[in-house]
From Swiss-Prot:
Name of the protein described by the UniProt record: Golgi apparatus membrane protein TVP23
Membrane spanning stretches: 15-35, 36-56, 107-127, 132-152
Keyword vocabulary terms for this entry: Glycoprotein, Golgi apparatus, Membrane, Transmembrane, Transmembrane helix
Cytoplasm found in the keyword field: no
Organism: Vanderwaltozyma polyspora (strain ATCC 22028 / DSM 70294 / BCRC 21397 / CBS 2163 / NBRC 10782 / NRRL Y-8283 / UCD 57-17) (Kluyveromyces polysporus)
Gene it is expressed from: TVP23
Length: 197
């Protein structure tokens, strides 16, 4: 009981205790529904519930809690007009404002990195137990939490004054020669999007 009181007092020391609670709850609730959902609902209902909870967590983390708790924001550029596909917004590019609360930062980063690891462990367990349909559900969890972790890590390492080549130098996807047509396809898609909008 003392650990719960200590955790509660830690949350209260946050700059945004309600938002931090929603952020941590958004990480925990899909995991709880995955572990305990089969006790009180069928697989289809559990699958849909967990995917919707993961999507809610992805949206809240990417657009609200990341912006408020650690002053970072990222999005993926789908227009194909930029050479870098990720666009970042960071406290580093603006004049100094309110400082980042260390409790907010610590709990945010721990939850961002720990959640994909937990989903990966669940994925390994699904493979070992040959539960392929549950593995599909876990794969959604790995993808959504992993993309958020990747985006926020890239945003945190991003330097606004550095050239574009050094922004993504810690991890780059390989260039595959046969996939040059994807660039042309994205240009055609952006052409039609600009005409319709």
């Amino acid at each position: 009981m003392e650990q719960i009181n200590n955790f509660y007092s830690t949350i209260l020391k946050s700059s945004h205790p309600f938002l931090l609670s929603i952020h941590l709850g958004g990480k925990a609730v899909p995991l709880i529904f995955y572990v305990l959902g089969s006790l009180f609902m069928g697989f289809t209902a559990q699958f849909i519930s967990v995917v919707l909870l993961l999507a809610f967590d992805f949206y809240i983390t990417k657009n609200i809690s990341g912006r408020k708790l650690v002053q970072l924001r990222w999005w993926y550029d789908t227009t194909g007009k930029q050479s870098s596909s990720f666009t970042f917004e960071s406290y580093k590019q603006f004049s100094p404002g309110p400082s980042i609360n260390p409790i907010d930062s610590k709990l945010f980063w721990w939850s961002i990195y720990l959640t994909p690891i937990v989903w990966i462990v669940f994925g390994i367990m699904c493979i070992l137990r040959l539960k392929l349909f549950y593995f599909l559900l876990v794969s959604v969890g790995i993808c959504l939490t992993g993309i958020n972790a990747y985006g926020f890590r890239s945003c945190d390492k991003w330097e606004p004054n550095a050239n574009e080549d050094s922004n993504n130098s810690w991890f780059q996807l390989p260039t595959i020669p046969g996939l040059d047509n994807l660039n042309a396809l994205s240009q055609v898609q952006s052409f039609f999007q600009s005409r319709s909008g």
